[in-house]
Amino acid sequence: MALSSQIWAACLLLLLLLASLTSGSVFPQQTGQLAELQPQDRAGARAGWTPMLQRRRRRDTHFPIYIFCCGCCHRSKCGMCCKT
C-alpha cells in the first residue's frame, strides 16, 4: 500500500514537473532564436513578430485592469482611473 502511494506521488510529481517545463512562455525561446539568425534574416523575422506583439499589448475590454482614481475623469471619486 505504501509503495503504491509512493509511486502515485512520484508520477504526479513527474507530471507536474513536465507540465511546468512545457508551459513556459513562447517568447523567451523565440527571442533566443532571433539572436541566432543571420542579420539579413532578422528583419524578416521581426516583421513577422510585430502583429503578434501588437495583439499581445491590446487589453481585453471585458476584464479591464483599473488603478485608484487620480482625479483625471469628471467623477473624481469613482475609485477607478480612466487613463488605465
Swiss-Prot record:
InterPro entries: Hepcidin
Protein keywords: Antibiotic, Antimicrobial, Cleavage on pair of basic residues, Disulfide bond, Hormone, Secreted, Signal
GO MF assignments: hormone activity
Keyword Disulfide bond listed: yes
Record propeptide residues: 25-54
Subcellular location: Secreted
Cystine pairs: 69-72, 70-78, 73-81
Signal peptide: 1-24
GO cellular component: extracellular space
Main location: secreted
GO BP terms, alphabetized: defense response to bacterium; intracellular iron ion homeostasis; negative regulation of iron ion transmembrane transport
Pfam families, A to Z: Hepcidin
Function description: Liver-produced hormone that constitutes the main circulating regulator of iron absorption and distribution across tissues. Acts by promoting endocytosis and degradation of ferroportin/SLC40A1, leading to the retention of iron in iron-exporting cells and decreased flow of iron into plasma. Controls the major flows of iron into plasma: absorption of dietary iron in the intestine, recycling of iron by macrophages, which phagocytose old erythrocytes and other cells, and mobilization of stored iron from hepatocytes.
Quaternary structure and interacting proteins, as annotated: Interacts with SLC40A1; this interaction promotes SLC40A1 rapid ubiquitination.
Similarity section: Belongs to the hepcidin family.
Protein name in the entry: Hepcidin
Organism: Pongo abelii (Sumatran orangutan)
Lineage per the UniProt record: Eukaryota, Metazoa, Chordata, Craniata, Vertebrata
